Amino acid sequence: MSIASTQADKKSSNHPNKIKVSGVILVDKPQGMTSQQVVSKVKYLFKSPNHDSKKAGHTGTLDPMATGLLPICLGEATKFSHYQLDADKSYQATILLGSQTDTGDADGQVTAEAPIPAFDDALLDKVAQQFLGAQQQIPPMYSALKKDGKKLYEYARAGIEVDRPPRDIVLKAIELKAIDEQQIQLTVTCSKGTYVRVLAEDIAKAMGTLGHLTALRRLQVGDFKIDETIALADLEALPLEQRQTYLLPVDACIDISAELSLSSEQCERVQMGQRLNVIDQLTDDVQSYITTAIDQHLAANNNSAADSQNIEDTNDDNEQQLVHEIPIDIRLIDEQGAFIGLGAVSLNGRLQPKKLIQL
């Protein structure tokens, strides 16, 4: 069970007479607005003499030209927005072949042109397969990434190109379809950090020509889908009470299935930042979740899951202790089943409060 978004007993600490607006809203971002402009608009739409909506942020930037799913976290939900920053994302894009722009999309200036070779579905399928899976991608100059404290697009606007280290990305699904003799449609599911503008340019090059994006729409972020969104104009047309019905719970961004139920006394203690011994409360499901997460943690640090099993089986007391002390984030709920935050729990039963919502 999740905490409701705008309960009257949740007063803002900055404005004690106001209700803190907390939750996640899925907005269909319109073309032409920056992601931050959409956030500012949403903050305004949830503001009232009785409601405080000053704290808000999105879970991953969309370019001004792009449309589609933009999850926005308000209030206490901002504590958990990073879970969606790391989530896989799906996009649908239109690539115009035959020309390249300085920004990689239709907002830029054409810098080069090339003839477009004939192509069919078989060729598009072959090209798509070349890009499936793990690879490295060099970020574009027109991006908000920083070098020496300065954003790359600031260098680009000054006509300066700087070296950018390639980044590891994974394309988990990709499909190319012909629209006409000059345009193709790209549908892709990719890992965080993927620039679809760069992908579009690379696809065009693989086809023997140049290309740039003329349309980009985000369809999915983690488990959030485009058909769950509300258009910004539609949200604005609603009275405040109806806008609030579109708020998802504060924990909507969290992709963690394991949960630990705490007594009222334990809830009070974790709210004060105290560690707890919960070894007797770790169910088989929770222990299994922690063990699996530890395996994944070790694998991410260049150890295989088999290696982690060997560590558990070893007679080396220090290594055995190390594995059992690795903290894993799980949900914390109270006796009524209401979400109260996240805690880091290890197999030795140690619970460290991590991110708690303010009741």
UniProtKB/Swiss-Prot annotation:
The EC designation for this entry is 5.4.99.25
State a single Pfam family of this protein.
TruB_C_2
The record's section on NCBIfam families has: TruB (TIGR00431)
Keyword Oxidoreductase attached: no
One GO biological-process annotation of the entry reads: mRNA pseudouridine synthesis
List, in alphabetical order, the Gene Ontology terms for molecular function in this entry.
Answer: RNA binding; tRNA pseudouridine(55) synthase activity
- CDD domains listed in its UniProt record: PseudoU_synth_EcTruB
Lineage of producing organism? Bacteria, Pseudomonadati, Pseudomonadota, Gammaproteobacteria, Moraxellales
The entry's protein name is tRNA pseudouridine synthase B
Catalysis performed (reactions): uridine(55) in tRNA = pseudouridine(55) in tRNA
Family classification: Belongs to the pseudouridine synthase TruB family. Type 1 subfamily.
**Gene that specifies this protein:** truB
Give the species. Answer: Psychrobacter cryohalolentis (strain ATCC BAA-1226 / DSM 17306 / VKM B-2378 / K5)
Cite the PANTHER family for this sequence. Answer: PSEUDOURIDYLATE SYNTHASE TRUB1, TRNA-PSEUDOURIDINE SYNTHASE
> So where's the catalytic machinery, residue-wise?
63
Q: What's the domain of life for this entry?
A: Bacteria
* Class of the enzyme per the UniProt entry, highest EC level: isomerase
Protein function: Responsible for synthesis of pseudouridine from uracil-55 in the psi GC loop of transfer RNAs.
Keyword Isomerase present in the record's keywords: the answer is yes
Entry keywords, A to Z: Isomerase, tRNA processing
